[in-house]
Amino acid sequence: AADEFRDLYGCKLVISRAGADVMRERPELVYLKASPNPYATLFTPDLELEDGQVLTLGNTSIRCVLTPGHSPGVMSFFFDTCEDGRTYHVGYFGGAGFNTLYREKLLADKLPLTMRETFLESLQKVREYPVDVVLGNHPRQNETLAKREQMLRQPGTNPFVDPGEWKRFVDELTGQFKEFMEAGN
């Protein structure tokens, strides 16, 4: 579908250089064959991002940080947004799932078991970033829907703004993953 988006909308396709390397060198790891979506195909990116590169879209600058673990090319993103004259720092951790880090899965995919330590290192790499608003990979990861419902019930509140949530999120994910590994997964 990426190529179709580029054709329809004239957008640029962007991915980390590490992710692009995986698509070129190990396309089977992209898991497109398992997708029922007929548009799930490999694509050629227009831009391959390096760790720490800043991508500017309009008046928003996004710091792109390589945080491998879930996959070798995962990136996390950090940018600022404004509301009512205040600036908030937004953070998005690129790959919070463990499903690719089971010992058997890594061995079957011929990926190093050190990907598990790499995941933990990636979490620590971004833990101290100043983040006021956390965007989760999936709504359940940071109670996105409940926060939105609260905003509707209590106009004028914004539960998305929580300067402590980022470190809690990283610490909880770190603890959960350590338990996952201690359980022999």
Each language-model region and where it sits:
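Metallo-beta-lactamase
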Residues: F43-D46, V54-T56, S61-E165
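Intrinsic structural disorder
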Residues: C11-K12, G85-T87, N185
